[in-house]
């Protein structure tokens, strides 16, 4: 894919800024808005295809436990009897009912869950459960990016506090020099009368 910066360079290098080339700018901007530059930290990558490596692993579902085996039919039955009830409320009710069951009532569902887990291990011997990462950190890192990715590189988004303090110190120092340059010069040479008054006051 042609990068946004190279596309802009090719557009402005053409004679007369052809309209056909200019029409491609919004499309390139939209496509490039989903991709960070290579200088982004690997911890906060925002590329749209970042999760492609684990896509095959994520498609494999976890084997059902005893509660899931039991609640399949119960959830469907409760949803039909209470069509206006929310899923969260249904889950709470099913959890309460599951706790009220005796061990003898739960045992058949534990046996079925063990069979399903054994079949799952045979079918996917290299399967490892990996909980999904929260997308909050990715959203925060992507929100720091500018609207136009070519204007400011990703590495400049994360400010360096030390450099920021140095810049503020330099700016303050330059302002003070500018203000001192406009002040009238101080006459350090005093007249003989003033020196006599000062020496007389010190003797007293």
Curated annotation (Swiss-Prot):
Ranges annotated as DNA-binding: 60-128
Pfam families to which the protein is assigned, alphabetical: HMG_box (PF00505)
Biased composition (Basic and acidic residues): 194-204
Record's signal peptide: none
Record key words, sorted: Acetylation, Activator, Calmodulin-binding, Cytoplasm, Differentiation, DNA-binding, Nucleus, Repressor, Sexual differentiation, Transcription, Transcription regulation
Post-translational modification: Acetylation of Lys-136 contributes to its nuclear localization and enhances its interaction with KPNB1. Deacetylated by HDAC3.
Main location: nucleus
PROSITE patterns (alphabetical): HMG_BOX_2
InterPro entries associated with the record: HMG_box_dom, HMG_box_dom_sf, SRY, SRY-related_HMG-box_TF-like
Example of a GO MF term: RNA polymerase II cis-regulatory region sequence-specific DNA binding
GO BP annotations listed: cell differentiation; male sex determination; positive regulation of gene expression; positive regulation of transcription by RNA polymerase II; sex differentiation
Region described as Disordered: spans on this chain: 175-204
The family this protein is said to belong to: Belongs to the SRY family.
Subunit structure, as described in the record: Interacts with CALM, EP300, HDAC3, KPNB1, ZNF208 isoform KRAB-O, PARP1, SLC9A3R2 and WT1. The interaction with EP300 modulates its DNA-binding activity. The interaction with KPNB1 is sensitive to dissociation by Ran in the GTP-bound form. Interaction with PARP1 impaired its DNA-binding activity.
Name of the protein in question: Sex-determining region Y protein
Species assigned in the record: Macaca mulatta
């Amino acid at each position: 894919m042609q990068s946004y910066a190279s596309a802009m360079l090719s557009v402005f290098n053409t004679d007369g800024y052809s309209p056909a080339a200019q029409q491609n700018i919004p499309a390139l901007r939209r496509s490039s808005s989903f991709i960070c530059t290579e200088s982004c930290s690997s911890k906060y990558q925002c590329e749209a295809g970042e999760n492609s490596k684990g896509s095959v692993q994520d498609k494999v579902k976890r084997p059902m436990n005893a509660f899931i085996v039991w609640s399949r039919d119960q959830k469907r039955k409760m949803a039909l009897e209470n069509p206006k009830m929310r899923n969260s409320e249904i889950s709470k009710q099913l959890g309460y009912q599951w706790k009220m069951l005796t061990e003898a009532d739960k045992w058949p569902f534990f046996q079925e869950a063990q069979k399903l887990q054994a079949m799952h291990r045979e079918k996917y011997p290299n399967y490892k459960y990996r909980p999904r990462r929260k997308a909050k950190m990715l959203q925060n890192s992507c929100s720091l990016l500018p609207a136009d990715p070519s204007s400011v590189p990703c590495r400049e988004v994360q400010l360096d506090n030390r450099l920021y303090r140095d810049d503020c110190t330099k700016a303050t120092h330059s302002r003070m020099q500018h203000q001192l340059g406009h002040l009238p010069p101080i006459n350090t040479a005093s007249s003989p009368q003033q020196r006599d008054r000062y020496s007389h006051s010190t003797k007293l």
